[in-house]
């Protein structure tokens, strides 16, 4: 068992019965020219987040944790995105951006596109699981719950973008399904102003889970390994 220093209190878990969740580290969310950038969100400070996720993934894999990568998006015709009868049609900033800029139609969050791809620095390895998801929550219309329960996994460590949207949505849904969720705050990035990051982390540590950081996580898994990994 491993005890991780976190807010509001430490949490103990078995790494081999836990998963590291990497949420939507796609060009869409972390790279200039991707969806978030084109929709007017600031992605200029995502590079340190990518590096921190690399470090967390390396440590988690060495400790025997399952690594799950999410990719948010839809088919090329956007059927999976939902039509006017879906709130997603009206609230998705990707869909709204494409309606405002028709030349982008088929380029944002479409499976097979550059936008949909994971950033070059983050490459899933054999044994990892890569899951597409059609909405903010990684539990909605995906096999995530079944995958975790079949492996006896109850503790989830979250990284990725955006803290206040898909990361928080997935962690909240996990809370309702009796999963223990931890966010590594320096391995996440918000969509919107800095206060959105702070508010999401406040919500998580106060109501839904725990908040820690990459160095503390790596030290908890192997106290002597962090310097080597970094």
Curated annotation (Swiss-Prot):
Query: What general EC class does the enzyme of this chain belong to?
Result: hydrolase
**Which top-rank group of organisms is this from?**
Bacteria
Asked if Signal is a keyword of the record, the answer is no
Pfam family membership, one: Isochorismatase
Give the reactions, separated by semicolons, that this protein catalyses. Answer: (Z)-3-ureidoacrylate + H2O + H(+) = (Z)-3-aminoacrylate + NH4(+) + CO2; (Z)-3-ureidoacrylate + H2O = (Z)-3-aminoacrylate + carbamate + H(+); (Z)-2-methylureidoacrylate + H2O + H(+) = (Z)-2-methylaminoacrylate + NH4(+) + CO2
Q: Which UniProt keywords apply?
A: Hydrolase
Q: Which InterPro entries match?
A: Isochorismatase-like_dom (IPR000868), Isochorismatase-like_hydrls (IPR050272), Isochorismatase-like_sf (IPR036380), RutB (IPR019916)
Q: Which GO terms describe its biological process?
A: nitrogen utilization; uracil catabolic process
A Gene Ontology molecular function term of the record: hydrolase activity, acting on carbon-nitrogen (but not peptide) bonds, in linear amides
Q: Catalytic residues? A: 24, 133, 166
Induction record: Up-regulated by the nitrogen regulatory protein C (NtrC also called GlnG) and repressed by RutR.
> What SUPFAM superfamilies does the record point to?
Isochorismatase-like hydrolases (SSF52499)
EC number, as in UniProt: 3.5.1.110
Against HAMAP family, the record matches this protein to: RutB
Protein purpose: Hydrolyzes ureidoacrylate to form aminoacrylate and carbamate. The carbamate hydrolyzes spontaneously, thereby releasing one of the nitrogen atoms of the pyrimidine ring as ammonia and one of its carbon atoms as CO2.
Q: State the family named in the UniProt similarity comment for this chain.
A: Belongs to the isochorismatase family. RutB subfamily.
* Identification of the protein by name: Ureidoacrylate amidohydrolase RutB
Query: Which organism was this protein described from?
Result: Escherichia coli (strain B / BL21-DE3)
Q: Which gene encodes it?
A: rutB
